[in-house]
A protein has these predicted regions:
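Acidic/histidine-rich alpha-helical segments that form the ligand environment
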Residues: 82-126
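Short, contiguous alpha-helical
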Residues: 34-85, 128-186
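Short leucine-rich amphipathic alpha-helices used at interfaces
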Residues: 4, 10-11, 80, 102-103, ...
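Extreme N-terminal tail/first-helix region
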Residues: 1-20
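Short N-terminal micro-motifs specific to bacterial/archaeal maturation
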Residues: 1, 12, 35-38, 93, ...
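Acidic/His metal-coordination segments adjacent to aromatic residues that form catalytic metal sites
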Residues: 2-5, 86-100, 139-147
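Structural signal for well-ordered, non-membrane alpha-helices
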Residues: 18-29, 55-59, 63, 107-121, ...
Length: 186
C-alpha cells in the first residue's frame, strides 16, 4: 500500500485521483445514470454511490469517536463479512440521486476529509493505535488512519475511474454499432 510523508502529500494524492475520477462523469447525461452495460458491474450512479458511501463512513467513524461513541466498523448494521450487503445498501441509499447530486455529495465528503486530515496531528494520522476505530476495525491488522483514508479515496478513485471509462467505452461503442446497423437498414 502506498505510504505518505505527510498530510500535504496525502491530500495532494487524494486531490489528483479525485479530480481524474470525477471528471469522467462530466460527459455522462443524466438519462444514462442507471444504464447497465456488459462487462461493467456498476452503473454510473452505482459507481458514485459506492464512493459516497465509503467516504461517508470514514467521516462518521471519526466524528463518532470524537463524540465519545463506540465505533463499529464498517457500520452499525454491517460486519466486514457482509460487504456485498453494504454495497447494496450504498446503492439503495444513494444511487437514486441525480449524478450532479452524487458528485456534489462526494465533493463535500472529500472537502470534509481534507478538514479531517487537517484536524489530526501527523502522529494521529500516521501512527498506529491513535484512533480506537482504526485500531479495532480489523481483527488481523492494525491500520493507521491514513490507510483507511487511502483505501477509501485514492485507491478506489483509480479503480472506479477505470470502471467508468470502460462503461463509457462499452456504452458509446454499442451506440456506434447500433447507428451503423441503422444506416445499413436504410
Amino acid at each position: 500500500m502506498r505510504t505518505y510523508e505527510n498530510k500535504d502529500e496525502l491530500k495532494k494524492e487524494i486531490n489528483k485521483s479525485f479530480a481524474k475520477y470525477i471528471f469522467e462523469f462530466n460527459d455522462i447525461p443524466e438519462s444514462l445514470k442507471d444504464k447497465r452495460v456488459d462487462e461493467v458491474d456498476r452503473t454510473p450512479a452505482e459507481n458514485l454511490a459506492y464512493q459516497v458511501g465509503w467516504t461517508t463512513l470514514v467521516l462518521k467513524w471519526e466524528a463518532d469517536e470524537r463524540k465519545g461513541l463506540h465505533v463499529k466498523t464498517p457500520s452499525d448494521d454491517f460486519k466486514w463479512n457482509q460487504l456485498g450487503e453494504l454495497y447494496q445498501w450504498f446503492t439503495d441509499t444513494y444511487a437514486y440521486l441525480s449524478l450532479q447530486e452524487l458528485k456534489d455529495m462526494l465533493n463535500d465528503n472529500i472537502n470534509s476529509i481534507y478538514a479531517m486530515i487537517d484536524s489530526l496531528s501527523e502522529e494521529e494520522l500516521f501512527k498506529p493505535h491513535m484512533r480506537k476505530w482504526s485500531g479495532e476495525a480489523t481483527k488481523t491488522a492494525v491500520w493507521e488512519v491514513y490507510k483507511f483514508i487511502h483505501v477509501n479515496t485514492v485507491a478506489p478513485f483509480g479503480t472506479f475511474r477505470t470502471k467508468i471509462r470502460k462503461w463509457k467505452k462499452k456504452h458509446y461503442n454499442s451506440e456506434v454499432v447500433l447507428l451503423n446497423k441503422m444506416e445499413i437498414l436504410i
